[in-house]
């Protein structure tokens, strides 16, 4: 079972997950990594957890088991290389230390359609690394758009992050979280209702944009 129970991307295949902070990267000297991570963490706290868009997120958040990494990549090729490094690191690291990784990439795949196409590359990397069934990638983007929606439809904001993000997830953590939630099938529909009630003005009031 996938994290579709929380939300879907344009191709209806992925969704949000478990969060918290344990580390950050060294990256472009012209970019304030702390500010990028702070903006991303605020989005997690105010939107993902605050609006209960993913009921599984809060428990992991308080355990501080998320690795935040700001990528300096400016090309898809460079991002892929770093993604593979982070996939291997997550696979090699005890889940008690790092349960999930948020790979934030402000300088590449800023166009959502390009980003969405890259998700197939990410899936292929997992397969090539023999990590299928162990890890998967969830997707968030400032211009996230579900299939069959208009750009400004409020439901798209369930997966809109301050910066493009690839979230690296452990399959076994996903399975345990879904098994523990009594009505996982209803999460996506509930999220749409939450966003419709909140509206665009309510979303803007959360101040979860980029730094």
Which role does the model predict for each range below?
Residues 25-211:
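Expand to "…catalyze enediolate/carbanion chemistry for C-C bond making/breaking, isomerization
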